[in-house]
């Protein structure tokens, strides 16, 4: 009976990890939650094993130890969150991003009309769905993923997005061949193309079990805390997942930047781990636009401390809502007001 209980607990722990995929890293909030769940599970097992009723709880030394560990975890997490916040680290947050002033007309060269993105993401999604609807041999099995990553492909601004399985049943019937294509949209000309692959993609967000891209990455890099993944293609059209790795520069949970990048071939699942400075030239989305905007907002609003950013707001600068992209010199630039 005891062996069965132990096996059951181990299975529960394993299933919880397999489903939630927390990084084994003290900087990951999910890891702290995982530890809390483990301690609570240990308390439940201890109570059942000792057959304790609620009146015995106060007298049980073993249970007191377990609950003490739980209290330490909760207090440490709360303290770590507070001590990592901009409230007590305004200067450190303000210095996360190095900003250089420039002259727009000199720093940004004049672009030809066919290099300026005229479509936003919502418009790209409409074009992608329309293209997918015309593919009678695929439309019943696949849909277009909502990712639509903005990249610079052969000096043109394009958005790319993989197809995804229309349902779990469609995954079972098509998993052997994988996902056969991705959508590519020229953001300047509106030309929309469904690019078919010689071999299907077998590591995607819509795959299940060990072929799910998040699970695949977690088992290969158990300690890495990944930022939002983006879908890109190299200059030959090979599909990849670009997986930025977060670095926490302030306390346990604050001051997020990007330290490394993992590239995962969406067809084979092969991965390569790079430092940011060594990332291949074709990769465009090491830093997400949201992260860059957040870092600039820290720089612009925290010059005179946190409370000034909330109350007096002297000398505070913040970005306007929304942003867009420019493709310049094989790079993607984010611009906003």
Residue ranges and their predicted role:
Residues 2-337:
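Soluble extracytoplasmic regions of secretory-pathway and membrane proteins
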């Amino acid at each position: 009976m005891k062996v069965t209980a132990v096996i059951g607990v181990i299975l529960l722990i394993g299933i919880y990890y397999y489903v939630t995929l927390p990084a084994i890293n003290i900087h990951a909030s999910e890891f702290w939650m995982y530890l809390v769940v483990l301690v609570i599970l240990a308390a439940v097992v201890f109570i059942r094993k000792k057959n304790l009723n609620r009146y015995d709880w106060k007298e049980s030394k073993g249970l007191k130890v377990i609950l003490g560990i739980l209290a330490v975890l909760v207090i440490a997490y709360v303290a770590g969150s507070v001590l990592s916040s901009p409230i007590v680290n305004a200067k450190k947050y303000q210095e996360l991003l190095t900003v250089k002033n420039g002259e727009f007309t000199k720093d940004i060269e004049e672009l030809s009309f066919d290099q300026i993105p005229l479509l936003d993401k919502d418009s790209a999604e409409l074009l992608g769905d329309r293209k997918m609807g015309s593919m009678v041999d695929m439309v019943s099995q696949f849909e277009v993923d909502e990712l639509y990553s903005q990249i610079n492909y052969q000096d043109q601004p394009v958005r790319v997005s993989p197809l995804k399985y229309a349902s779990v049943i469609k995954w079972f019937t098509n998993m052997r061949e994988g996902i056969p294509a991705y959508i590519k949209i020229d953001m300047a000309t509106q030309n929309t193309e469904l690019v078919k692959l010689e071999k299907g993609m077998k590591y995607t967000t819509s795959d299940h079990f060990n072929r799910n891209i998040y699970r695949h990455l977690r088992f290969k890099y158990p300690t890495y805390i990944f930022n939002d993944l983006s879908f890109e293609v190299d200059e030959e059209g090979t599909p990849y997942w670009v997986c930025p790795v977060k670095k926490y520069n302030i306390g346990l949970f604050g001051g997020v930047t990007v330290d490394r990048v993992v590239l995962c071939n969406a067809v084979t699942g092969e991965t390569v781990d790079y430092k940011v400075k060594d990332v291949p030239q074709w990769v465009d989305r090491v830093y997400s636009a949201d992260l860059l905007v957040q870092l600039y907002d820290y720089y612009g609003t925290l010059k005179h401390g946190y409370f000034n950013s909330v109350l007096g707001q002297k000398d505070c600068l913040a970005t306007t809502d929304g942003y867009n992209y420019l493709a310049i010199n094989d790079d993607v630039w984010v611009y906003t007001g």
